[in-house]
């Protein structure tokens, strides 16, 4: 029976030590030696054979037998190990790499570590440091390995040591061989050992000259037997240097197989099928190993040829390797199991069972299947509250909750027991207090059981209305993909939810399925509803925007209700109010807007009642916001006079102007009605308003009727004509441009060639046509047109979709360009070759209503295909990216000391996000309070005609009197921890943890001072004293009756009450926004960056101001940044110029930076042969040099040629003739070529022919190489483009690497120059700059795609990548440098490598992080696990004092005696 997990168990795993079994351990734990290949004893009727791989001493795999060791059945016996004794030792494939490393560190003769005593001692001291962590230990061992590899001779026995490496493996038998190339270092130097070696071979060659050609490939073969003997000689202190802990029984020979453990039978069960059985891969491999081993043993006893023995040994080696890791051999080269054919599928070794998504780690430890869960299709139900979910009664009967019987609920539980399992509400099981087994209520006497129900018994009852359940939809991309709802049991077969809650789940009702989970303890229920409840998650932690809000039909309904021409008589009004309230709320109906001829109320009044139904409701909101389609009023008029009623003004919960559309009700807007209610009056009120809105809109829209049909998209004849005319005009303009292009007269744009310019211009023209036609189309359509209503209020689609249906579909774009040429020089065979016209390059002039022509249809489907492919590829890319982010950040949490630390207590940030505020509570622009809205709100709710208006200086004084005490509380400490007095604190440069709060108070002060200044200005305009400063005593007399004063009081009176209210709310909101200790800021940050990635487009380029300067954006860019890639697709250095107004100055700097090759400025290079010499003559084009503003003259070019690397031209051979000629003399003075000739023949006389030949080749070589010589600029930089910014200033965009060189170029402001290549920033400017660069780049990429992510999340990612002092990518390599936990790394990637590594170096995992705690089923120390609850006992202090021991007591007695 499953029991509830209890957190406070008496014993708790605090750490896991890894290690390997020695040969002794393997034999000690073994119950039987496996020595025969037979599995079954056929003579005794197919029972498992003794000593075979299925011996019953190792356990059983079916219920029919019983275990011969413990006599248990399948349920009670967990199995026992056996062992196989191998005839010869073999390498362990998991430790193969480590074995090679050990061999590289020791002498291959005497097994001593190849270091002198002093070095050994210093390394030992480093390794024995107390509290050294695994990361530092591994670094030390790596350094030691590097030093040992350099040592050529052993310092102990003076033996020569060469290179130890893995044999060049084809695959198969050679894969696990180690060779020792003894004389690799020696080369030609004579040493006695080498001479002896050569001598021996000479004797062999004299007998068999054929062998001579193999001499290069002769190595010393280190077979497992040799290695085993070497390892046995290693001393314990040397073991420690090799990273093996001999104090814990570690020895290097443990990592070579001599005895092989045979696992219990129950983990490799046989499948019986009528008189024959199917065996597990492991069993078959074990029998192969036993058989091969016995063959070798028999062969050694009989004395078989060495060739056969080695072959069998290799096969044994391979079998053992595949038993552990079946990837270790190439299946194509394996001897096949079934006679002639190749073995079909690779076997599943132990490693294959652990690794991968379905392996033990990810499939069964990090994530498991669970009980008490259900799954079915979802459908909408607007009559449910947003925090409810309708559960079908069939599901409710299966899912149960264990309720303990108390005196309060005994009667209820008795009723449920009587109902039984088939009637809802009922119960399925009963667990009596003193019994261990559950009673199934399907059977037995329920009446009797109900009577005997005692307090303390547990009844597993059906879930009922009001039970807390978790609701989830995959893919769970962020925290809000699983929320807690209250169950509502209903008939039918689907889960139902309010449509407002679709956004966080990203659910729609086209057949989506969702999962439900029922928490089984009171603690779990309390945590679920408080932390995951829908009401507590109306906002997204990504940016603090509302995510649960009105969608689709609700927005359309609200728009139609609140429209200017919506009027309702009393009957309709009352009906609407009942719809929104279930008829259980008292409504205070306001006076009607129209009295005669009949009383009518406006839709805005209905909506005002929705926000505040009656006087008892304390919701008073004040809001000013633009609608989605806001048309500004004529100049000088206030916003509310917008001609299309597009500006919402709400005062005291009364809607005065504007309509309700997506911007005021939808998600993602911080000036929406629900957000305002939530921030000022809490989530309950916001949820109530949302519930009323959902009920009202669904019913209203259903009664009114709202449909879309073909009639809605028929264009008028007028519209058709206008469209045709505009398209024709655009076609004519395009033809003119194409004509210019063909004649070569097209003026190019900066940084583009002619073709790019043509494409850019035509693209601009055609998109403009679509926009203009779209505008006309929208204006022509009737205001009651359904698609138009939806586009206007933002419930679905956009005006672009409407105009594509009605007027024109427009240009089809593929990867940011027009449709490319798919056939020879044309897009489709319907057009002529090299056609650039709009219709041949994907412009669709028809609308979807009029229908597309065949070529248009094809173009449209091409761009549709691109969208599909993009989506499919993107899903996989972003999914993997999110997983990596999550694994790297999952254990970061905010602590009680305000720092952000990881699970091993390493500090990542001193305060979260620099100010310790939670992104969830930000009101605007990542700030905790939206001052403007807060001021209006405070002003409106405290407004009293009797209040006296304050003078400007009084406002400033009042604010100071409230803020000063708060600021004085924030004391500063010096480095020793002493408090710094206030008067000295201004002189301090460094930041402390209270700086953010001081800044916040300062920003309040600035805002209020600004208000006071405005008031003073208004007073001055009305001819009154401004009073910005306090006047002298005798100037206090004021003329109260002044008309100006009355006017000012009406215009902008500021009362003491409203200032107090404003400050009180600002300070309250700031304190509420502080991040709570224990918050999993890392996990939330990872999701906040990963989740928007799924909405980004994949292949995105955008033009950084200049048409041809492409910058990678979207998912690939984010991937580059978080991988910390060394090579990125578009590295761009953005350099600010000293003289940024003058184009000539910019060109000069460009010439200094951009690589200029000789071929760019040379007319020609010709070869000249004369009788006595040959030279290359280069003519330089001085005009080009002048045009490009290059600082070059003929001498500097000659100098560059002479200094060109690799060409070896001597300076004396380069001469300048005239103004524009350079001659390069071609000689054979180059020392190398002469030496070659001398060596070629001993009697070198220097024949003429050979000299002429080599001269000719050198000439041709130089002729080819000279044009590519860089004569100016930085060799790594191929392009630089002058970009004109929006403010008219010029900057240089440089493509390529070389930040340091560009920064130090004359004419560039080095301090303002930056690059988008993170690693280069790190190398040039250091780690802080790299952190700032990571944050800036991710923020830039997100903002380009319109994603709002709070900067705190991005800062945290930047800090995680840099807090170790180097830039670590969010990959398995970066993660292994950040975290030391074996289980965390194993549950990420390369599972088995980490496990073998851990056991070789005997690592210790302390079980601190999230991944490890999940694997071991423990409470993690973040979130609600960040603290422990302690009970206080009333214990006398004396009782806790230490009592003297018996011995001490006797001493005291004797002393007194």
UniProtKB/Swiss-Prot annotation:
Annotated protein name in UniProt: DNA-directed RNA polymerase III subunit RPC1
Q: What Enzyme Commission number(s) does the record list for this chain?
A: 2.7.7.6
From the Swiss-Prot or TrEMBL record, state where the protein is found.
Answer: Nucleus
The source organism is Debaryomyces hansenii (strain ATCC 36239 / CBS 767 / BCRC 21394 / JCM 1990 / NBRC 0083 / IGC 2968) (Yeast)
Renumbered to this chain, region (Bridging helix) spans 854-866
The record ties this protein, via InterPro entries, to: RNA_pol_asu (IPR000722), RNA_pol_N (IPR006592), RNA_pol_Rpb1_1 (IPR007080), RNA_pol_Rpb1_3 (IPR007066), RNA_pol_Rpb1_3_sf (IPR042102), RNA_pol_Rpb1_4 (IPR007083), RNA_pol_Rpb1_5 (IPR007081), RNA_pol_Rpb1_clamp_domain (IPR044893)
Enumerate the catalysed reactions.
Answer: RNA(n) + a ribonucleoside 5'-triphosphate = RNA(n+1) + diphosphate
Query: What keywords were assigned to this record?
Result: DNA-directed RNA polymerase, Magnesium, Metal-binding, Nucleotidyltransferase, Nucleus, Transcription, Transferase, Zinc
**Assembly and interaction partners:** Component of the RNA polymerase III (Pol III) complex consisting of 17 subunits.
- What family does the entry list? Belongs to the RNA polymerase beta' chain family.
Q: Give the organism's phylogenetic lineage.
A: Eukaryota, Fungi, Dikarya, Ascomycota, Saccharomycotina
Gene behind the chain: RPC1
